Amino acid sequence: MTQVNNSLGAVTISLHWLVGLTFIGLMAVGIYMEETHAYALYPLHKSVGALLLLLVIPRIVWRLKQGFPAAEGDASPAAQILAKTVQYALLAGTLLMPLSGIMMSAFGGHGLAVFGLEIFPMNPDPADPNEVIPFNGLLAQVGHVIHGLGGKLMILAVVLHLAGALKHHFIDKDKTLVRMVKP
């Protein structure tokens, strides 16, 4: 699926940067929370992640409807395959990360509140109110595995995406990066 026109419109550019920068911020906060056990950040991480899902779905629909822009310059077949793989990985990851986070939290009994609005209830343990009882431990674990592995794969995909953009701009000297800034 390739666009005939190489230019990108304001909707494409806006969704790209809004989703991309928000996602990078969520990944940074997620890593920080995991490394430092900063539990106070979890509600913010969950809230922004759930709202991001509301942007990701239209972005994916828009991208699939519009197609991917044609490659600039003369990329090798291997480079074209790598670029397309990274593009699809980023689209899939921006959908799977919020969904798996919601799945992990909701099925794990932790609930989900988006900026205080309860979407999925918590399931506190009556014997210990500081603990929760999973609604479905298996689905919570599946969400946890997808979220953890997906986060690592998304870091790789983002690094490859940024490296490709910089290569196009500084080595190939084509318009790939410029077209993501100006409609």
Residue ranges and their predicted role:
Residues 1-183:
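Membrane-embedded alpha-helical bundles that constitute the cytochrome b-like, heme-associated redox core
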